UniProtKB/Swiss-Prot annotation:
One of its GO terms (molecular function) is monooxygenase activity. The gene is Cyp301a1. One of its GO terms (biological process) is tergite morphogenesis. Its main location: mitochondrion. It comes from Drosophila melanogaster. Keywords: Heme, Iron, Membrane, Metal-binding, Mitochondrion, Monooxygenase, Oxidoreductase, Transit peptide. Its cofactor is heme. This is Probable cytochrome P450 301a1, mitochondrial.
């Protein structure tokens, strides 16, 4: 954000010293048609819903709630200018905001306009309706049907449905897909992904990977016992190794020493970071890539093609292994990939499932871990509480982890939840409204993209007692040393809610719990450098080198 524009913005907004940086994790609903449609109310709405309009007025229009509500065009928000609308605010030189600063905008909008804000006039996009009322967010979630429309990345939609329609066809997966195609695909993979027996199967393999990672960390320490400046790349390697073990049924070799820049694991990491961290640029700036292949779009497609090739390679390997293996010799619980291949008889389904898990998982989990480690290193009192809990549960630091042991790690889990509340990696969620609604006393037409910036609501005193204080004990029950207070269940939802809740959430939780348990039982983490601000790339995380000091305890 250039200084002049930021100064002009702040002159109309009162920002407190504890302002939380936050932004919705929402990138618009894309389609083969590039333009948003204009409704009769003058609002740009999602083109996906245009074909489903009924001639008769919706039932809600006859209710007193609707008739007493204010019209949509009276919802407060930044005013668009002719031709450029509000898109100019994100443009270089003349704009008010940069992509990395966009986290601040959600909180600024709330401070300026209140609990509901209309951000319209975005070229090629539906209106964004920011909702800062947890009760209204709950109402939106609870009123959705069996196929909620979650706004997704138009760039990914175009890649799946146009650029690589030859591969995906009618099997788009669970990311960037909506309606019956989404419901059918999710129903085919949901059971094996969410089964507790599947989760338990990966505890020991993920623990081994994490132990290998910690050995590598020790080898990376310098003479001051500090980790290197690019330690976030090492966390990405750990995350990729974990996801590869789950989604591709293999060890990718990410944690090997002297990994070359052109090695497959590093290429996967680089491709994921590029693809995901440029999504905000692709989506929030003028979408020229919709009309002609820009350099950024061309590289995005190249990276996505690389992902597809990697997934196909390892899923085909798993399929061949199943074909040649004597069924009578299979022992124990089948792997996730094996379950999907055996139940669906279609390796493409397993390939697309793996692709979606990797795309969504690598950067999300990596950045969440970066944030958690930074908070641990800068909060020694909280770190010590977790260490004491782990020392009590694991007197012998070499004791293998089990699900019952993880279930007793209340302080560790409370710490994770508190980091998500105050510094949530996924900084918001949203829905494209499937029908006309009344929200915060306004008439809102279907097709509008409702944004739920939970990192704002999760830090509002209205919904959380002593919201500005980092207090993991708020998540614990009294018998476990907790100090419960007011905590609205829809104020902080890092994994979303309902039918479109994050499919890989149980694996994400398992990976993070294993890493923190193994790390904090055996090591002390410190950060002795300049405090880091948080910024948005694709995720919300500390912006700077994570030069942690890591010593055995």
């Amino acid at each position: 954000m250039n200084n002049l524009s930021l100064k002009a913005w702040r002159s109309t907004v009162s920002c407190g010293p504890n302002l939380r940086q936050c932004v919705p994790r929402i990138s618009g609903a894309g389609s083969r048609r590039a333009q948003c449609r204009e409704s009769s109310t003058g609002v740009a709405t999602c083109p996906h819903l245009a074909d489903s309009e009924e001639a008769s007025a919706p039932r809600i229009h006859s209710t007193s709630e609707w008739q007493n509500a204010l019209p949509y065009n009276q919802i407060p928000g930044p005013k668009p200018i002719p031709i450029l609308g509000n898109t100019w605010r994100l443009m270089p030189i003349i704009g008010q905001y940069t992509i990395s600063d966009v986290a601040k905008i959600s909180s600024l909008l709330h401070d300026r306009y209140g609990r509901i804000v209309r951000f319209g006039g975005l070229i090629g996009r539906p209106d964004l309706l920011f909702i800062y009322d947890a009760d209204e967010i709950e109402k939106c979630y609870r009123s959705e049907g069996p196929t909620p429309f979650r706004p997704s990345m138009p760039s990914l939609v175009k890649y799946k449905s146009v650029v690589r329609k030859d591969f995906f066809g009618d099997l788009g997966g669970v990311v960037g897909v909506h309606g019956e195609p989404w419901r059918e695909f999710r129903s085919r993979v949901q059971k094996p992904v969410l089964q507790l027996s599947t989760i338990r199967r990966y505890l020991q393999p993920l623990e081994v990977i994490t132990e290998d990672f910690l050995v590598r960390c020790e080898n990376l320490l310098d003479e001051n016992q500090e980790l290197p400046e690019d330690f976030d790349n090492e966390i990405h390697k750990w995350s990729l190794e974990c996801i590869g073990r789950v989604a591709l049924d293999t060890r990718l070799g990410c944690l090997e020493s002297n990994l070359k820049p052109d090695s497959e694991p590093q290429q996967i990491i680089d491709a994921a970071k590029y693809a995901l961290r440029n999504v905000a640029t692709l989506e929030l700036k003028a979408p020229y890539w919709r009309y002609f292949p820009t350099p950024l779009w061309t590289r995005y497609v190249k990276n996505m093609n690389f992902f597809v090739g990697v997934c196909m390679k390892y899923i085909q390997s798993a399929t061949e292994r199943l074909k040649t293996q004597d069924p009578s010799l299979r022992a124990g619980e089948p792997s996730l990939v094996e379950k999907v291949i055996l139940s669906q008889k279609d390796e493409k389904i397993a390939t697309i499932m793996a692709l979606d898990l990797i795309l969504v998982g690598i950067d999300t989990i990596s950045m969440a871990v970066c944030s958690m480690l930074y908070q641990l290193a800068t909060r020694p009192v909280d770190q010590q509480k977790v260490h004491e809990e782990l020392k009590r549960l694991l007197p012998d630091p070499n004791t293998p982890l089990t699900i019952p042991l993880l279930d007793q790690m209340h302080h560790l889990k409370g710490f994770i939840k508190e980091v998500f509340r105050m510094y949530s990696t996924v900084i918001g969620n949203g829905r494209t409204l499937m029908e006309d609604s009344v929200i915060c006393g306004y008439q809102v037409p279907k097709g509008v993209q409702a944004v739920f910036p939970t990192i704002v609501t999760g830090n509002m005193e209205e919904y959380v007692t002593d919201a500005a204080t980092f207090r993991p004990e708020r998540w614990l029950k009294p018998q476990h040393g907790g100090t419960p207070g007011k905590l609205h269940p829809f104020a902080s939802l890092p994994y979303g809610y309902g039918a479109r809740m994050c499919l890989g959430r149980r694996f994400a939780d398992l990976e993070m719990q294993i890493l923190l348990a193994k790390l904090l039982r055996n090591y002390k983490l410190e950060y002795n450098h300049k405090p880091l601000d948080y910024a948005v790339t694709f995720m919300y995380a500390p912006d700077g080198p994570l030069r942690f000091k890591m010593t055995r305890v």
